[in-house]
């Protein structure tokens, strides 16, 4: 599971590189024009994905383990 912050303008670029299991969750942040993006990502892909997410505009990236995933 990966969570990150970004500007609204970066959302499409992030979605283009994010191999999410379904659509990501996008939440507004306190600062105008800023969002949080949360997505379930295969654990085998996450570490190779991080540089691309940074290049797409993601900041404050958190990677969390998933105990169980119910499809």
Specify the residue positions occupied by each region the protein language model found.
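Small-molecule-sensing regulatory modules
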Residues: 1-71
């Amino acid at each position: 599971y990966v969570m990150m912050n970004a500007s609204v303008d970066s959302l499409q670029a992030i979605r283009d590189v994010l191999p999410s299991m379904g659509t990501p969750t996008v939440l507004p942040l306190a600062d105008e024009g800023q969002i949080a993006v949360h997505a379930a990502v295969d654990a085998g892909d996450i570490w190779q994905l991080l540089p691309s997410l940074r290049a797409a505009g993601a900041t404050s990236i958190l990677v969390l383990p998933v105990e169980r995933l119910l499809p």
